[in-house]
């Protein structure tokens, strides 16, 4: 069969066997790759299709950068070599057919049929005249009759198709079509036409996504609720993991004091005062506080734990990415605080120095999770050099050998999870995220923890992502959460505060 341009959904490497983009539920098991729907019941197939639709709609709404993009298998990979061999075999077979006496147009007719369907799919609803023209010029029965009489003019049809493509394509494809016009070999020309048509289909899909995004955003909550309810009706146990997740959150919030001597700052603590008696362990927590505790727990989720709440499965990959960013910011802020404590405030009043130190630390801590000791050894040495050079450039007293050794030791000690500075920074960051959930981003920024001021920009960006994602989830699944929480916390308290976003 001809090679069609492979495309994938951004942030999702899954591709269906026929080359069409297929959504994949985050957290999907690798074993599912061998799962064959053809052998399953119609109800299961319908459920999978509904989940796919829901996943794509959700992705478009919450991911502003969502689009379909071209992907090419690595040429040296087994998959890449196999695919290339199969495609070459097809095109060589087509060439043999066209060069035979008399010419065999079997494969050519199939290709022209595919080209016709693709061209028609690129038309807008009101382009009826052009639609009729394509139907007539590429009429399958007529082309078949011409082929039977050996009169099928492939070069002429290819030129006609190129003219249509030039008319329908986005400006970004003009150059590719101009290159096709210089190809004289009919087989290579057909191959190029199909490749560029695949890109044009991708462009049309992205245009459609962009056009429909405002509509989807306006109706996404009702749509996702309706689709999820349909799935819940078919599978009543669909909220089992969600119930476990909220139960654990309720336990956590009643056993952990919401504020402690190590809490960020008094101003931030006051801004994030906990409603509905959540600050008193003798009182049951409100549904909203339990839900927000559950959201924060997602950033600590064990990757080996498969019991991920069903209502957040579509955001699992995003939450994992946010958890990774949170971890990176914790290490970054810890490094900056230690470095500032040794070098003094004067050096850290230089934006150029702070930015340079942040860039260096970010680059070196990319592999902190997999190689913490080696990473922090490199970080400590580089930061020590930066501090020494920075103090020297500003005409300040450089660190003594003793202080340098102490700086290196404290930086390397950040590797340990129980490190005092790292633990406090982690508390500050999570407390800030709780502030964002409770009171919104603007108020939280007004009471930003002083100890995190060096990463204010990065943490605000993380907070926005987390807040927007959880806000959308709360709007969609709030009614389900409220119903579950009625059975987890005291009924009177459950009715006191609805699970609605602030």
From Swiss-Prot:
Originating organism: Homo sapiens
Underlying gene: TCP11X2
InterPro entries: Tcp11
Cysteines joined through disulfide linkages: none
Gene Ontology BP term (one): regulation of sperm capacitation
Pfam families referenced in this protein's UniProt entry, alphabetically: Tcp11 (PF05794)
CC annotations in GO: acrosomal vesicle; sperm flagellum
Positions of the UniProt region annotated as Disordered: 1-36
Family stated for the protein in its record: Belongs to the TCP11 family.
Lineage, highest ranks first: Eukaryota, Metazoa, Chordata, Craniata, Vertebrata
Name the record gives this protein: T-complex protein 11-like X-linked protein 2
């Amino acid at each position: 069969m001809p090679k069609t341009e492979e495309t994938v959904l951004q942030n999702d490497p899954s591709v269906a066997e026929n080359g069409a983009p297929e959504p994949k539920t985050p957290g999907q098991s690798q074993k599912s790759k061998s799962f064959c729907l053809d052998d399953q019941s119609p109800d299961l197939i319908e459920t999978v299709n509904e989940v796919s639709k829901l996943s794509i709609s959700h992705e478009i709404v919450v991911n502003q950068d969502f689009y379909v993009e071209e992907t090419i298998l690595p040429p040296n990979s087994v998959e890449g070599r196999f695919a290339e061999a199969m495609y070459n075999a097809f095109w060589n077979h087509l060439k043999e057919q066209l060069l035979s006496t008399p010419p065999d147009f079997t494969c050519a007719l199939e290709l022209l049929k595919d080209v016709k369907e693709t061209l028609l799919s690129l038309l807008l609803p009101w382009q009826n005249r052009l639609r009729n023209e394509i139907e007539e010029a590429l009429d399958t029965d007529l082309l078949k009759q011409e082929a039977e009489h050996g009169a099928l003019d492939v070069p002429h049809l290819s030129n006609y198709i190129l003219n249509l493509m030039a008319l329908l394509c986005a400006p970004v494809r003009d150059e590719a079509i101009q290159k096709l016009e210089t190809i004289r070999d009919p087989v290579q020309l057909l191959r190029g036409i199909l490749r560029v048509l695949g890109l044009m289909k991708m462009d049309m899909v992205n245009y459609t996504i962009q056009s429909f995004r405002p509509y989807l955003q306006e109706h996404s909550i009702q749509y996702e609720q309706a689709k999820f309810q349909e799935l819940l009706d078919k599978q009543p146990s669909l909220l089992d993991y969600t119930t476990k997740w909220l139960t654990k959150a309720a336990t956590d919030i009643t056993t952990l004091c919401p504020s402690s001597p190590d809490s960020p700052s008094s101003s931030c603590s006051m801004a994030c005062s906990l409603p509905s008696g959540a600050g008193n362990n003798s009182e049951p927590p409100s549904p909203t506080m339990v839900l927000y505790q559950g959201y924060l727990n997602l950033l600590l989720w064990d990757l080996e734990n498969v019991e991920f709440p069903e209502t957040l499965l579509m955001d699992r990959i995003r939450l994992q990415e946010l958890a990774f960013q949170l971890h990176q910011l914790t290490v970054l802020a810890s490094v900056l605080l230690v470095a500032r404590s040794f070098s003094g405030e004067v050096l850290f009043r230089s934006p150029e120095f702070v930015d340079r130190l942040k860039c260096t630390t970010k680059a070196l801590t990319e592999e902190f999770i997999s190689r913490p000791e080696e990473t922090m050894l490199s970080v400590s040495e580089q930061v020590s050099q930066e501090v020494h050079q920075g103090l020297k450039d500003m005409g300040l007293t450089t660190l003594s050998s003793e202080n340098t050794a102490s700086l290196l030791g404290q930086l390397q000690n950040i590797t340990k999870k129980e490190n005092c500075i790292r633990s406090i920074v982690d508390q500050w960051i999570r407390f800030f995220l709780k502030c964002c959930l409770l009171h919104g981003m603007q108020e939280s920024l007004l009471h930003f923890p002083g100890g995190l001021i060096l990463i204010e920009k990065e943490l605000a960006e993380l907070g926005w992502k987390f807040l927007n994602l959880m806000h959308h989830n709360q709007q969609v699944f709030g009614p389900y959460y409220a119903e579950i929480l009625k059975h987890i916390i005291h009924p009177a308290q459950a009715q006191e505060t609805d699970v609605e976003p602030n």
